[in-house]
């Protein structure tokens, strides 16, 4: 038996367009992102891959991407599970900062270490910052678990228990699962699925709005490592654009 998992990074956001570090700041999609989300839903229909259950983060850019895609696929009625553990990586004190300015200020080596290394987080975000989530009611129950900064390793640590307890359980029940989340939370999950090394994960980019489908075997190993993008040509072009963020 194989299990079907669909990963969908949220569409282009207002801060993607402004080239800002976003993290846990709850910005919305822009027009491009809404169009990407709609196209993502159309791709699901065209390939007859329709989800039975949806997982999203608590951030509106992922929630709205899922809503638009599911509306296009006429699957707005499926069960929805939202959890903070699918949130984007917390970028600490970099949240709200311009990527190009950060690159110019700190140099490429430090910039890339913060942005792409597996285990080096940026400096923590002060709770009094306008970009802090310390007083956000959706995280009121987290207590000390609320991050002030994260590296990709931290994201993997929070996602894996949720993958094991919830997402995998729905897959085992024979459901086609859609996870609509973020660049780094999805990179962490793909790292686990594909067994990508701590070093190689730095080179993995996930494009916005293009469904990535994994067929998993009985041991939850990918039948095809890396999965399959439902629009491979668009994915290749978009991956290059993601890789070049901050260099303009």
Curated annotation (Swiss-Prot):
Keywords carried by this UniProt record: Gluconeogenesis, Glycolysis, Isomerase
EC number(s) per entry: 5.4.2.11
One Pfam family of this chain: His_Phos_1
Any one GO biological process: glycolytic process
Originating organism: Pseudarthrobacter chlorophenolicus (strain ATCC 700700 / DSM 12829 / CIP 107037 / JCM 12360 / KCTC 9906 / NCIMB 13794 / A6)
Residues binding substrate: 9-16, 22-23, 61, 88-91, 99, 115-116, 183-184
Superkingdom to which the source organism belongs: Bacteria
Molecular-function GO terms, alphabetical: phosphoglycerate mutase activity
Active site: 10, 88
Matching SMART domains: PGAM (SM00855)
Cysteine-cysteine disulfides: none
Protein name: 2,3-bisphosphoglycerate-dependent phosphoglycerate mutase
Annotated catalysed reactions: (2R)-2-phosphoglycerate = (2R)-3-phosphoglycerate
